[in-house]
């Protein structure tokens, strides 16, 4: 997932004969072309000074993909606590520069809701992944088998 949100190459590090093709295909189209974002994922400002490592909040990172002039936002939340504690946390879409409620896909859960914040309750080393649609669009548009459901059409 993080490689797919890196806006760069995706390297497969599995041993020969042990690659899970289903996971690899989440990063690319059938022809092998990567489904890329505009820029690499980056932590939100409030996560830059150690709060996730201290177990005070989840590590939230975002990337965007611009397609046909619309901006799709991809958000990953990871529990990186060094104390290995369960963390309940939320992130307002306003903190990402997104105004008002949006259609949000919980990619792992396969559910779509309309909300103005993302929430996660994660065990140590667990992760959540969300797709936030542009205003007026549904987050479950696109290819839901892929990490980048609506890839960028920017060069």
In which residue ranges do the predicted regions lie?
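Active-site-proximal substrate-binding groove within the catalytic cores of carbohydrate-active enzymes
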Residues: 1-138
